[in-house]
């Protein structure tokens, strides 16, 4: 590719738009991967009245927020728009956007929109109850968060929108479209629709035909890092970027996060610790899990896929515990000028491994085909305040998250026969030194912590640089730019202790699922259609 910019001649930067579940961010990096500035705004995805499980994505308001973030990032960086060499976008997966014939976005939903529960059940019965299996074998996805039941819901309940729809994209593609006026999807994000073939990295319209849905709404597929278009004059007025700035195809947040971590080769493994914890393992070729417990997604690196097993609400659970029970610690931490989690970790470090036998019951390991969880609770508490207190419960939560993570990695190993020798731990959870060490002790693997905490945005910026001709290879650039802050080595004795804790927790969790099955307790989360 011809170089559009010569970094040695001028100081250029790359912008990444990161559309997460809870916020939109515009992050500016220099060409060595250093974060220069960020603009951020929270957004909320509200339920539609009388539509249970819905999570609408407000296209007009959220585009305004995205533009504000881009302007804020440019202002905070103190650089002129002409020095942004290229921009790309990544987003939460599963969220979809529909457009009419004029190219106007007309409807969108966020990632865990669960309005289509009845449609999921209906689709599962198709073709002698084999339809979901056919979808999974071809795409690596089940129906729970797929676009197929959502489209069927629109056909049933909003036929006006369904009839108008002429194109479908992901939220990252919508951002790129709003900047450039060009519509396309990339495999890594579109793969989560349940409509993209893992092997060909292209749409599989036969699945829509099998579901009795229209197959004429599928937009062009372009690989991450491909030049899509340029910022239009209209978009430039709104967002502050210069008209003509290259707009590059982005991708899914997890896969681009792995690019930003240099996790770009087969068998490399990462744990991304945010609101959800994603345990991902790179696979050299498409393969799916015979038990259908694990999802499989296209990587942003062509030809490679990622087995992904998800822990539910891990980061959210920690935030709930902090906000619900640790008001005193929040005040103390504020006076000390430290993060509340840092103080809680210091307290938890004095609790012995195993947390006096306390067992948190929150997320289960991923069971993609029948995905639900037990009711949130703590089991095996003691009334001895020296043994059962906030520090004990906090450590127990960190240990349990690590146990669930290890279970998720194990079930990937069971079907892929890939046994990692180390793992990368990134995201908010990796800021905790105690948590990182516990993950090493539980998994029995060395845990590497990167310097860059904005791995997803960095991966997106790398894609922008490739599309602009600044970088020649996404994989090589990801490996070159990643830097390591520290490594945690597992303690064999603690690993053995945690193996016993893991076995006990798995047995207790199964009993807790039974209470949900009998209607005695309420699941933490249940996939649509169960």
From Swiss-Prot:
It is found in: Cytoplasm. Keywords: Cytoplasm, Kinase, Transferase. It comes from the Bacteria. The keyword Transferase applies. Its EC number is 2.7.1.189. One of its GO terms (molecular function) is autoinducer-2 kinase activity. The keyword NAD does not apply. One of its GO terms (biological process) is quorum sensing. GO terms for cellular component: cytoplasm. It catalyses: (S)-4,5-dihydroxypentane-2,3-dione + ATP = (2S)-2-hydroxy-3,4-dioxopentyl phosphate + ADP + H(+). NCBIfam families: PRK10939.1. PANTHER family: AUTOINDUCER-2 KINASE, SUGAR KINASE. Belongs to the FGGY kinase family. Catalyzes the phosphorylation of autoinducer-2 (AI-2) to phospho-AI-2, which subsequently inactivates the transcriptional regulator LsrR and leads to the transcription of the lsr operon. Phosphorylates the ring-open form of (S)-4,5-dihydroxypentane-2,3-dione (DPD), which is the precursor to all AI-2 signaling molecules, at the C5 position. This is Autoinducer-2 kinase. The gene is lsrK.
């Amino acid at each position: 590719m011809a170089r559009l910019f010569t970094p040695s001649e001028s100081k250029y930067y790359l912008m990444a738009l990161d559309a997460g579940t809870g916020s939109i961010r515009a992050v500016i990096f220099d060409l060595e991967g250093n974060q220069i500035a960020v603009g951020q705004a929270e957004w909320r995805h509200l339920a539609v009245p009388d539509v249970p499980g819905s999570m609408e994505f407000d296209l007009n308001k959220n585009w305004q927020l995205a533009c504000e973030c881009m302007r804020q990032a440019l202002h905070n960086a103190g650089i002129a728009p002409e020095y942004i060499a290229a921009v790309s976008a990544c987003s939460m997966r599963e969220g979809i956007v529909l457009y009419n014939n004029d190219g106007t976005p007309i409807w969108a939903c966020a990632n865990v929109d669960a309005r289509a529960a009845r449609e999921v059940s209906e689709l599962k019965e198709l073709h002698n109850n084999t339809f979901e299996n056919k979808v999974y074998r071809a795409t690596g996805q089940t129906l729970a968060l797929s676009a197929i039941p959502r489209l069927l819901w629109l056909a049933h309940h909003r036929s006006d929108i369904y009839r108008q729809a002429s194109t479908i994209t992901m939220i990252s593609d919508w951002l790129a479209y709003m900047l450039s006026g060009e519509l396309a999807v990339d495999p890594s994000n579109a793969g989560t629709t349940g409509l993209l073939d893992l092997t060909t990295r292209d749409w599989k319209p036969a699945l829509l035909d099998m579901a009795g849905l229209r197959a004429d709404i599928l937009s062009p597929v372009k690989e991450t890092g491909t030049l899509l278009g340029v910022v239009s004059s209209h978009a430039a007025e709104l967002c502050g970027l210069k008209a003509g700035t290259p707009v590059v195809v982005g991708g899914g947040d997890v896969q681009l996060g792995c690019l930003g971590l240099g996790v770009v080769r087969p068998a490399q493994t990462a744990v991304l610790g945010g609101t959800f914890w994603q345990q991902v393992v790179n696979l050299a070729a498409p393969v799916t899990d015979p038990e259908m417990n694990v999802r499989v997604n296209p990587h942003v690196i062509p030809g490679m896929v990622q087995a992904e097993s998800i822990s539910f609400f891990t980061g959210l659970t920690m935030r709930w515990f902090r906000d619900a029970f640790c008001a005193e610690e929040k005040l103390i931490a504020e006076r000390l000028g430290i993060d509340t989690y840092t103080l809680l970790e210091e307290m938890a470090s004095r609790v012995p491994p195993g947390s006096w036998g306390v067992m948190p019951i929150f997320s289960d390991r991923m069971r993609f085909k029948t995905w639900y969880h037990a009711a949130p609770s703590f089991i095996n508490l003691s009334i001895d305040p020296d043994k059962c207190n906030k520090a004990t419960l906090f450590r127990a939560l960190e240990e349990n998250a690590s146990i669930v993570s290890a279970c998720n990695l194990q079930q990937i190993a069971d079907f892929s026969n890939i046994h990692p020798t180390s793992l990368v731990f990134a995201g908010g959870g990796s800021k905790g030194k105690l948590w990182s060490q516990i993950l090493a002790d539980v998994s029995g693997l060395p845990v590497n912590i990167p310097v860059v905490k904005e791995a997803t945005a960095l991966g997106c910026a790398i894609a922008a640089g490739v599309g602009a001709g600044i970088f020649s290879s996404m994989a090589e650039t990801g490996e070159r730019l990643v830097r390591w802050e520290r490594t945690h080595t597992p303690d064999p004795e603690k690993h053995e202790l945690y193996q016993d804790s893991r076995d006990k927790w798995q047995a207790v969790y199964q009993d807790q699922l039974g209470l949900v099955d009998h209607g005695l307790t309420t699941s933490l989360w249940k996939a649509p259609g169960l």
